[in-house]
């Protein structure tokens, strides 16, 4: 299952992770985000070597701005922070 990440735990969950981390920036009102969600959840279940996280941009607009998210869904792969 994908981990919901907040600003206060982003460093621990993503930046300091020991392996690759896939982050899905999404919003509940976004139709394409809702279509992508089952794929992200399936990926999280099947790929144990990649940590999968989700960031709700309505709840965490600072994270979206920090990483230059201009549209959603946006998926970013972090490696070594």
Residue positions per predicted region:
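Proteins that catalyze or organize thiol-disulfide redox chemistry
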Residues: 1-51, 58-80
């Amino acid at each position: 299952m994908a981990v919901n990440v907040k600003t206060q735990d982003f460093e621990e969950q993503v930046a300091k992770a020991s392996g690759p981390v896939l982050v899905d920036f999404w919003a509940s009102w976004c139709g394409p985000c809702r279509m992508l969600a089952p794929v992200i959840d399936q990926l999280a279940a099947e790929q144990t070597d990649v940590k999968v996280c989700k960031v709700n941009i309505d709840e965490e607009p600072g994270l979206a701005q920090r990483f230059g998210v201009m549209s959603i869904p946006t998926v970013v792969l972090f490696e070594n922070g």
